[in-house]
Amino acid sequence: MKTATVFVLVALIFMTMTTAWALSNPKEKPGACPKPPPRSFGTCDERCTGDGSCSGNMKCCSNGCGHACKPPVF
């Protein structure tokens, strides 16, 4: 009985986390991220978590260490 309860709780936690992730990271916005200049390292701050966390048409892109919102390249 205890094993079944633990299994159900783990399954519920997994489903909740998966749903929360899917809602917080909508589909990728059009365009590509600009490439960071060679031998450059941006700040290691995570200023975005996905395209959905950037305003307008901005994309969440790597800056060489962390991520920041950047205008897309087409």
Curated annotation (Swiss-Prot):
Family annotation (Pfam families): WAP
Residue stretches making up the WAP domain: 26-73
Subcellular localization, as worded in the UniProt entry: Secreted
SMART domains: WAP
GO biological process: antibacterial humoral response; innate immune response
Record keywords: Protease inhibitor, Secreted, Signal
PANTHER family: WAP FOUR-DISULFIDE CORE DOMAIN PROTEIN 18, WHEY ACDIC PROTEIN WAP
Name of the protein: WAP four-disulfide core domain protein 18
Native organism: Bos taurus
